[in-house]
UniProtKB/Swiss-Prot annotation:
Its main location: membrane. The gene is Fgr. GO terms for biological process: bone mineralization; defense response to Gram-positive bacterium; innate immune response; integrin-mediated signaling pathway; negative regulation of natural killer cell activation; peptidyl-tyrosine phosphorylation; positive regulation of cell migration; positive regulation of cytokine production. Interacts with ITGB1, ITGB2, MS4A2/FCER1B, FCER1G and FCGR2. Interacts (via SH2 domain) with SYK (tyrosine phosphorylated). Interacts (via SH2 domain) with FLT3 (tyrosine phosphorylated). Interacts with PTK2/FAK1. Interacts (via SH2 domain) with HCLS1 (tyrosine phosphorylated by SYK). Interacts with SIRPA and PTPNS1. Interacts (not phosphorylated on tyrosine residues) with CBL; FGR tyrosine phosphorylation promotes dissociation. Interacts with CLNK. It is found in: Cell membrane; Cell projection, Ruffle membrane; Cytoplasm, Cytosol; Cytoplasm, Cytoskeleton. InterPro entries: Fgr_SH2, Kinase-like_dom_sf, Non-receptor_tyrosine_kinases, Prot_kinase_dom, Protein_kinase_ATP_BS, Ser-Thr/Tyr_kinase_cat_dom, SH2, SH2_dom_sf. Disruption phenotype: No visible phenotype. Mice lacking both Fgr and Hck are normal and fertile, but show increased susceptibility to infection with Listeria monocytogenes. In addition, their polymorphonuclear leukocytes show defects in cell spreading and adhesion. Expressed in natural killer cells (at protein level). It comes from Mus musculus. This is Tyrosine-protein kinase Fgr. The keyword Transit peptide does not apply. It catalyses: L-tyrosyl-[protein] + ATP = O-phospho-L-tyrosyl-[protein] + ADP + H(+). The active site is at D370.
């Protein structure tokens, strides 16, 4: 990620000369078109055709390799009678891996047969089975993970190169008096003969040999490799095999986490085994049939910056079962003591994570429609994930109406969406600009002192919120770009992600020279 995108995707200049006049002179039909996803069904949404579609950041599953003996990367406790309980290091014979999420396996130690989550296992003796191998994660996520608590100087990981297919990168946590803790990255290059090297004077037959060498001597690296980066067990891809439409009685609602206009959010347990979050919708909020169709699409959206949809109860009252995020909504988090103490680098990083998730949705041509801090969830290590994507389109409540309803999020909604129902990725970009103000102000309601009608009238005439106190001018400029009246002049989420990820990047090269001393 980084500077390459910034240069390629630089949005138009700041001045919108004549834009307001053009906006006002056109008719609604000339300016806007109907919501392109109205009436869409799951049959026209991109289907998962390969593991690449379902990549969730640090997923380690392997398919199509011909390897049938796999090793467990983590402990796992069976959730159903069809699952296998296993411990880290246990070996399996994979019997059937035709379904991507859950594979049928037989334990070589116990002889028991059942299903295992595919992202909890890897081929024996492969690079994917190594604790230091993190697979297809971004450079920025590598930095986030290595800078988290518990990692000493010299903590490291190896990941797939973002720029060179088939190559790898080594990321190391370092420290010095001037910069404190920071991360350095090294390219691992591949020889034509099949070996690997960082510097030509030290070549190795395998990545494992390379790691063993640099754990014994730094040999030109910034620091000796001391320990693999700490990690937590990933979310399984779904609750269990075929656990999609589930029985309401399999969910125990334990503690109410929040209440909204259309229902409540609970901490719950599925099948007496798995902690989950459960959104319960009031009867009449949306059509169960329409919800189930949309949910079939939503479950195909998989990215580590999107809250994973686990399962549904499709009869009223509808239950939406998702992964549990320990700190709740970003809005509530910003308002409490820990959120109030966050500094600008933390806030910008949280914004970058949201932009990353939205960039994925942009690539998938999926529209959120209700992007705001209340619909971003926060987990350990300040990980942010996007929630409630796509649900706003299904709400049937008369009060959820931009013209007169009190429940519609006018202050976050682009004018073309609020006035004419023109929801697009670009209207999500507008909402992201408003979300940036929520971050900078630690949860302040947008457009303070203005009601919804005033906001709609003023925004249509080109009004922008002034720069929030303490907000850098360069960040406010991005907000203003997101609020351009012409949707096509707003930046892409790909650009926003790159801009925010590189916001504090110094002038040092992205990768360290392999021969540095």
């Amino acid at each position: 990620m980084g500077c390459v995108f910034c240069k390629k995707l630089e949005p138009a200049s700041k001045e919108d000369v004549g834009l307001e006049g053009d906006f006002r002179s056109q008719t609604a039909e000339e300016r806007y078109f109907p919501d392109p996803t109205q009436g869409r069904t799951s049959s026209v949404f991109p289907q998962p055709t390969s593991p690449a579609f379902l990549n969730t950041g640090n997923m380690r599953s392997i398919s199509g390799t011909g390897v049938t003996i796999f090793v467990a990367l983590y402990d796992y406790e069976a959730r159903t009678g069809d699952d296998l309980t296993f411990t880290k290091g246990e070996k399996f014979h994979i019997l059937n891996n035709t379904e991507y999420d859950w594979w049928e396996a037989r334990s070589l130690s116990s002889g028991h047969r059942g299903y295992v989550p595919s992202n909890y296992v890897a081929p024996v003796d492969s690079i994917q089975a190594e604790e230091w191998y993190f697979g297809k994660i971004s450079r920025k996520d590598a930095e986030r993970q290595l800078l988290s608590s518990g990692n000493p100087q010299g903590a490291f990981l190896i990941r797939e190169s973002e720029t060179t297919k088939g190559a790898y990168s080594l990321s190391i946590r370092d420290w010095d008096q001037n910069r404190g803790d920071h991360i350095k990255h090294y390219k691992i290059r591949k020889l034509d003969t099949g070996g690997y090297y960082i510097t030509t004077r030290a070549q190795f037959d395998s990545i494992q040999d390379l790691v063993r060498h640099y754990m014994e001597v730094n040999d030109g690296l910034c620091y000796l490799l001391t320990a693999p980066c700490t990690t937590t067990k990933p979310q399984t891809l779904g609750l269990a095999k075929d656990a999609w439409e589930i029985d309401r009685n399999s969910i125990a609602l334990e503690r109410r986490l929040g209440t909204g206009c259309f229902g409540d959010v609970w901490l719950g347990t599925w099948n007496c085994s798995t902690k989950v979050a459960v959104k319960t919708l009031k009867p009449g909020t949306m059509s169960p049939k329409a919800f189930l169709e949309e949910a079939q699409i939503m479950k195909l959206l998989r990215h580590d910056k999107l809250v994973q949809l686990y399962a549904v109860v499709s009869e009223e009252p509808i239950y939406i079962v998702t992964e549990f995020m320990c700190y709740g909504s970003l809005l509530d988090f910003l308002k409490d003591r820990e959120g109030q103490n966050l500094m600008l680098p933390h806030l910008v990083d949280m914004a970058a994570q949201v932009a990353e998730g939205m960039a994925y949705m942009e690539r998938m041509n999926y529209i959120h429609r209700d992007l705001r801090a209340a619909n971003i969830l926060v987990g350990e290590y300040l990980i942010c994930k996007i929630a409630d994507f796509g649900l706003a389109r299904l709400i049937e409540d008369n009060e959820y109406n931009p013209q007169q309803g009190t429940k519609f999020p006018i202050k976050w909604t682009a004018p073309e969406a609020a006035l004419f129902g023109r929801f697009t990725v670009k209207s999500d970009v507008w909402s992201f600009g408003i979300l940036l103000t929520e971050l900078i102000t630690k949860g302040r309601v947008p457009y303070p002192g203005m009601n919804n009608r005033e906001v709609l009238e003023q925004v249509e005439h080109g009004y922008h919120m002034p720069c929030p106190p303490g907000c850098p001018a360069s960040l406010y400029e991005v907000m203003e770009q997101a609020w351009r009246l012409d949707p096509e002049e707003r930046p892409t989420f790909e650009y926003l992600q790159s801009f925010l990820e590189d916001y504090f990047t110094s002038t040092e090269p992205q990768y360290q020279p392999g021969d540095q001393t």
